Regions:
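A short, Lys/Arg-rich alpha-helix, primarily the initiator
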Residues: 1-27
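Residue-level signal for the short linker/turn that defines the boundary of a DNA-recognition helix
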Residues: 12, 28-29, 57-60
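The alpha-helix within a helix-turn-helix
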Residues: 18, 35, 66
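Short alpha-helical DNA-recognition segment
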Residues: 25-48
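Helix-turn-helix DNA-binding elements, focusing on the entry/boundary residues of the two helices
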Residues: 31, 42, 59-62, 73
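Short, basic-rich loop-to-helix N-cap that marks the start of a DNA-contacting helix
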Residues: 52-64
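Short C-terminal boundary/hinge segments that cap the last helix of small helical domains
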Residues: 57, 70-81
Length: 81
């Protein structure tokens, strides 16, 4: 797997687990809310979750997302692009 494919996989899984979180919780986390919680611009989260994105993310931000969504960090590396 190359860098672009890895970035796509991570982005796909961030979106998947954010939407899954929203189905299970009353307090929804939108892209805007997630970006606010991370302290990044919303365009970064939108680009990350985009189906054709190759936007990367820092390991620190990925760690923060895993804590916010209550998902083990290794889950973001599972699956196919």
């Amino acid at each position: 797997m190359n860098k672009q494919e890895l970035n796509k996989l991570i982005g796909k899984n961030v979106k998947k687990y954010r939407l899954l979180y929203n189905t299970k919780n009353k307090n929804k986390i939108t892209q805007a809310k997630l970006s606010e919680m991370l302290g990044v611009h919303m365009s970064l989260v939108a680009a990350l979750e985009s189906d054709n994105s190759t936007q990367g993310i820092s390991i620190y931000n990925l760690y923060q997302i895993s804590k916010i969504l209550n998902v083990r960090i290794d889950k973001f590396f599972e699956g196919d692009v």
